[in-house]
């Protein structure tokens, strides 16, 4: 089955997302999918909270004159903005944009709050819906007109040095987040022609899907003083002078959820990382006539023990065990525990891992420790397996000549022969938009790989 078909099918079968809402590019998180989203963003929230970020919530509506204040910024997506033009039947004097992103909203308010150097640093974030009128082919959780889960952080600092340190911290936070959901990434400094509008530079996190295409799943932007000058975000320095704040912003969206679905899944269904699984353990009683009660009591006992640490579900439906196994494999539950009369007699339990199908018989009295050990290995194994997959999608080609046309043909041939990311040793003379136009692919930017600097190239979503 082609990846595209598998992806669309698993979103429905596993109860993740329903795209039948009557607006293109808008869908509904189903309860199971919403829990994956919730647990994922809880990890991200904790990482931000632990580094002194404060969560907040800003309005969705942005006045046209405020959005237009940052000219270079709005040029990056002015054709994608949704506009509110009426209140009821009455035309509005000033059109209101549905939030495409929140720089203009947040920086207008930061100006009200930041007066002196002691007000800095200010590190805010929110998780909100954003809207873009995507004209390309929309795909659930990948390319949406309503992005339902956009975590955007915005910071302001008194010095350029503090601003640069914040960029490093943001990259570390995102690195830890993607490790937690077992997603390997390639980090690139985006080229000048593809950086965030209004930024000094952009760092981006990309991963590779099973079809070999690359997807951007996180960005970190150094804004310098560009937005601060536009919004007159000034503060009084320790020596009594005035200066503009130095700013950063960084975002992660529903694409993080799409990535963990796509990268870990297999022909049976989802394979969910431990920490974001709505159900971490499913208990399945194996019932035999005349011994139902003893099995049910044991299942209840184990469930009570396991629920002290994990999210547990007992599947007591009156259907065959094989059907239950299949259902929970589709949903990607990390661990299945089976208990039958013989297991009870022997003081055992059978545990089955979703990531590799390994079946183990363990001592029932020690079930909590056995599960903990299994989960530690599961998490490490899932990240290692995903990393090995990503490495197979990386091709390094030598650049012994500086001829633009010859190199572009070499890159195009490499892309036709292998999916994923092509790495070309960096040469300043070929790192430009003209080169990108010749290769029928995207230049992701400058990437450090095995200690060397490369131009990274890929076909993208």
Curated annotation (Swiss-Prot):
Q: Cite the InterPro entries for this sequence.
A: aa-tRNA-synt_IIb, aa-tRNA-synth_II, aa-tRNA-synth_II/BPL/LPL, Anticodon-bd, Anticodon-bd_dom_sf, Pro-tRNA-ligase_IIa, Pro-tRNA-ligase_IIa_arc-type, Pro-tRNA_synth_II
Which SUPFAM superfamilies does the annotation name? Answer: C-terminal domain of ProRS, Class II aaRS ABD-related, Class II aaRS and biotin synthetases
Record keyword ATP-binding present = yes
Localization recorded for this chain is: Cytoplasm
Biological processes, Gene Ontology terms: prolyl-tRNA aminoacylation
E.C. number, please?
Answer: 6.1.1.15
Write out the catalysed reaction. tRNA(Pro) + L-proline + ATP = L-prolyl-tRNA(Pro) + AMP + diphosphate
Q: What is its main location?
A: cytoplasm
- Listed GO MF terms: ATP binding; proline-tRNA ligase activity
Q: Which Pfam families match?
A: HGTP_anticodon, ProRS-C_2, tRNA-synt_2b
Regarding protein family, the annotation reads: Belongs to the class-II aminoacyl-tRNA synthetase family. ProS type 3 subfamily.
Record's domain comment? Consists of three domains: the N-terminal catalytic domain, the anticodon-binding domain and the C-terminal extension.
Q: What does this protein do?
A: Catalyzes the attachment of proline to tRNA(Pro) in a two-step reaction: proline is first activated by ATP to form Pro-AMP and then transferred to the acceptor end of tRNA(Pro).
Q: Subunit structure, briefly?
A: Homodimer.
This protein is called what?
A: Proline--tRNA ligase
